[in-house]
Each structure stands twice: as structure tokens, then as C-alpha cells.
Amino acid sequence: LSIEQGEIVAIVGVSGAGKSTLLHILGILDTPTAGSVIYKGINLTQLSAKKQADIRNLNFGFVFPFYNLLPDFTALENVLFPGLIGSRFSGRKAATKSYTERAISLLGRVGLGDRVTHKPSQLSGGERQRVAIIRALINNPEVLLCDEPTGNLDTKTGHEILELIWNLNTTLNQTVVIVTHDEEIAKHAGRVIRIVDGCILE
């Protein structure tokens, strides 16, 4: 399996086929039992756990079905955490002001400019998922990995979230890999990968 920079790739298959497992392997959240994950010429599976964490935090953004927002922190604070961790990983001092400005700007782009001080319990499902997407983007990753990002949203909100992801791909030239069971979503991807009986089909 090879994925090029700037592609939108949908991974589809029946429940339990291994879609999420493949996504987790691509993002080095899981280790493959065989084979390798090559990113920009580097075999990620051969790196130390710390180096994998460095690359994962700075180069990959993750969006999950559940928002996984920290309930005691505001939308802005939730978005900031990966950025501040990333600044340490890359050897820079935590540039809090710079990351805060970027986070506020990104939240504004998705219609949450007036919600930055709200905690997750004060946000709707769609707003929480938008916060989760912006959190995934705070380090300007080259790859966005989405696991059923609309799975827990109503149809209208789900479409809005997908439009956001497609627009980010266009404006930022990010590679997007999205796991979905929805064939309508898959139709909007540039390429569809099917997992059947443990095999990858295109």
C-alpha cells in the first residue's frame, strides 16, 4: 500500500475487517506483526518508542469517532496541548503565544471563534468534533488520519465535518486517510481501499 502526499484515501470494509487497525498501524499507534511502515524514506517500525512519539506528534494528526476532549479544560486549552508537547519534542521552547494565536485562528476558521473558552460540556457534538479536528491540526501535520470522524454525529453535522476535512485537504495540501463504513463518504475520496478477508484491495 502506497499513499502519496495530498491524497484523500478512504478505507472501507465490513465491521471487524481491520480498517481501524490499518489506520493505527499507519499512524504508528500499533506495531505490525509483519512488514514495515515507511514515511519519507524512514522505516518507522524500526525507531525507538520515543522517536516514534516525536514523529507521530509532529507529522500525524488523529481524529477519532469519540472526541476524547479533556472535560476540565476549555476548547482552546484542548487544542493547545499537542502544540506545546510538539514544541518540546522539536527542541524549541514552548511558544505559548504563537500556539495560542494559531489555535484561535484555526478555531475561528471552523466557526468556533466565540467558543474558545467553553468547556466540552458546553459544546454540541458537532462543535466538539470540530475542536478535535483543530487539535489534530495544531502542529500542521502532513498526514490527517480519521477513524469514522462522523460516526457519532447526525447527518447534517456529519456533512459539515466532512466538508471541513475536504477543505483542509485542499487549502493545506494535507494527506487525508479516512476510515468509513459509509459508501457515500468514500465516493468523495480520491481513492478507495477495501479490506476484504484481511487483504487490501483497490
Task: Locate the predicted segments by residue.
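ABC family nucleotide-binding domain
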Residues: 1-188, 192
